[in-house]
Design a protein with these regions (language model features):
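C-terminal alpha-helix
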Residues: 222-230
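Acidic catalytic loop of the alpha/beta-hydrolase fold
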Residues: 179-183, 210
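Active-site nucleophile loop of the alpha/beta-hydrolase fold
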Residues: 2-4, 208
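Short alpha-helix in the alpha/beta-hydrolase fold that links the catalytic acid
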Residues: 4, 160-161, 170, 184-193
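Alpha/beta-hydrolase
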Residues: 5-160
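Short glycine-rich catalytic loops that host catalytic nucleophiles or stabilize transition states
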Residues: 202-208
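Short beta-strand/loop motif that positions the catalytic acidic residue
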Residues: 167-169, 174-176, 180
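Catalytic histidine-centered segment of alpha/beta-hydrolase-like enzymes
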Residues: 208-220
Length: 232
């Protein structure tokens, strides 16, 4: 949620960037919402800015631990126990980040954004994303500094299919459920298109949700036929 104004205050909000603000197009669940494309562009840019701010907090924490580790190596544990103890505990310390409001994709409520067959809402909301954004649980809410940087940061993580798929050269199939509330068809196609394999297959599983409930046999048959044609 890019409208978070203070990482230490879950209620501190920049109204102009709040997707749950009526002036920006939000309506209470289950009414559909409509977000202006120009506002949405500012929103997406602000999301990147917030990730950068969290990255800076995480990197500063890691740098402090590294610096303390370098200092402790120069200390005589037997000769200066107090100084060694202080720097050693700083060196091994792991900061935990509480990352508030992580369920804030306007596409959850505005189905005209990357239109597909998905319903309103999110896999992680029960059912209202507004409540899930502020409620307990959610994605990446409590992370170590290294955990945030390596897995969730869109700027620092190396776990990016855009970077890794070009190195995948084996035959590749992607079965995309068209009613997935989390992954857009555009994104699924981009994943396949970026693959380094000469043999790629993209299949849309019409009406299937994220975990393929009600469509798993169909998905299994698709994958089995694909494997049989290449490896039987």
């Amino acid at each position: 949620d890019p409208s978070v104004a203070d990482e230490n205050d879950p209620f501190a909000t920049v109204p102009e960037l709040d997707m749950y603000e009526p002036d920006n197009g939000w309506r209470p669940w289950p009414e559909p919402c409509t977000y202006d494309p120009a506002w949405l562009a500012r929103y997406r840019a602000a999301q990147v800015d917030r990730v950068a701010r969290i990255d800076a907090i995480a990197k500063a924490s890691i740098a402090e631990s590294v610096d303390a580790g370098q200092r402790v190596r120069g200390l005589d544990k037997a000769g200066d126990v107090a100084a060694w103890r202080e720097q050693r505990r700083r060196a091994v310390f792991t900061q935990y980040l509480t990352i508030y409001r992580t369920l804030a994709d306007p596409a959850y409520l505005d189905l005209s954004i990357d239109a597909d067959e998905r319903p309103m809402g999110s896999l992680f909301a029960f059912p209202d994303p507004f409540e899930a954004n502020y409620g307990r649980g959610g994605l990446a809410r409590t992370m170590t500094a290294r955990g945030w940087l390596s897995t969730w940061s869109g700027l620092s993580s190396h776990a990016k299919l855009a970077d890794t798929m070009p190195r995948v050269t084996v035959p590749t199939i992607l079965v995309h459920p068209t009613a997935d509330t989390e992954i857009r068809m555009r994104q699924a196609k981009e994943i396949v298109d970026s693959a380094g394999a000469a043999d790629t297959t993209y299949v849309e599983l019409a009406g299937a949700p994220h975990y393929l409930e009600g469509h798993r046999r169909e998905a299994l048959a698709i994958v089995a036929d694909w494997l049989r044609a290449r490896f039987a």
